[in-house]
């Protein structure tokens, strides 16, 4: 049993009022989940306890005031039993607010007080620890108030644990969706790409960047401290920079076509995990906000939530130290509304938004996002999924059309179902055709198109969409410095399942070819141009899926496709294991392949060579590369003005190469271990660097050996082939 007794101590001539927490184990958690080995044979949670918590959570949700919530908690028999032998004055210090009292009693009601408020023998920091844990509990209680606060959070976790063993017997049909194949460049798709460019000023971008990246084991090389996914360097840029540069490339394309500079507002949902929020702020400051106005970004932080073990208990890292993890990206909508993100975007005339995740760096390749958003804009859709083929039996969610019949007719919902729920919904993961390795259901990629008003209207109906739990073995550090591994879960949620509330109703059943009548939509594209994630560290001999190495091979597959099929280059054959050459480019070079093919035409790249084009304005034809070539402009898209804002088109560097041969020793073989990071050691390299608005021209020349050509601003340099070599 818990009680707080008052002790007065004097320290450094100051008097402190200390509230010491004591526990007895006679009132313990009555809400226990059995181990998974037991749950496979019997229900994992006592039904009576589930019903009690469900009713308590519902009552807490419906309460109209904090006083009413407190009355509900005081009436709970677990709370009553807890206070049978002590008064409220003994249990709670006067400094605890009524909200804090409700939070503590909520923890008592769910049976976790004996863990959350446990005090180590001889502890001296009790009051500070209590204050800290109360702050966390209050944040959880407030954020999840729409589902019953702390009680609703805990009930959701254990009820999901129990329901994961049940079969959903609703009379619903799950139908493969019919979407627009944007890989087929027919007139409809080309028109929508054009719309995606022309109407970019109507669009905002929202990024979920709070990923913990536990499985990547990302650490600061100097301090050893863990780092969030946004800090991972991939193909020469951090994952956060990749997302921002992608949108800048589309803005730059709009500028080149229409002569108008746009600044797309970007909202970033961060998290508290691994100091993610502060890391994102630091990264933005280091990059000087990527040459964008500081006010064009809106950072909002998702709450961390208590982790729960297989026994249904909250996990602790020390005395009154909860193990906290991000609560899933499904909170993005409620959090965005609560923090004013929607209002901020609407004030800027943005009614639609593109949503992306931090761990998928290839989504901006070519014209996929422009076609996707173009369809959503031209057809005024309220929600969209950018989808692609999915391997049968892969651990990925699927996009489905859910059909349900009732007395009013037929209802349809284009949505997502996570792979861990297939059994629950009796979904069979079958191939699209006999012998195919691809599923009949396409992959959910978490690339979304949203109508802000429609989403805002549905948040109250579904504040935490797609609730789920997923147990994972997780290592964490205890306060004594030790490393502990537990199989844990927390209440997660999925942002894409806000679509569950976007239902279309018809009097008659619809044929698949009529699904275009939905207010939602789906596109198909090639998988390697849609999604390839970086979620975990590669283990030698293990699968490449979801590793940086695997993602880079998809990145290289796209580069191979671009050069061979669009730019008409002769390149080495594609290797499924290791890149046979390296090619990286700034997205502003296109980003459309059709535009890049106008700037880079006909040539040859020899095996093991590396071509890096960190420039937008180039004219390359007949290049023969055997070794390493890097062309970099200080001003890729323009010049930064006195306010630190990038002005598109002002003083960009330019380069023209016609029938140029580059020969050098190229990449050092021992530098290819972490090739996916994009930083190589070169035995020799030909590097052309253009300061500010500098220009470099070369025609019918051979650039041999290691060369460093720096062209000063305001200067045009021409390379000329002579008998004794090249002169400039």
Model-predicted segments: where are they?
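Domain-scale recognition of functional cores that engage charged ligands
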Residues: 170-207, 215-496
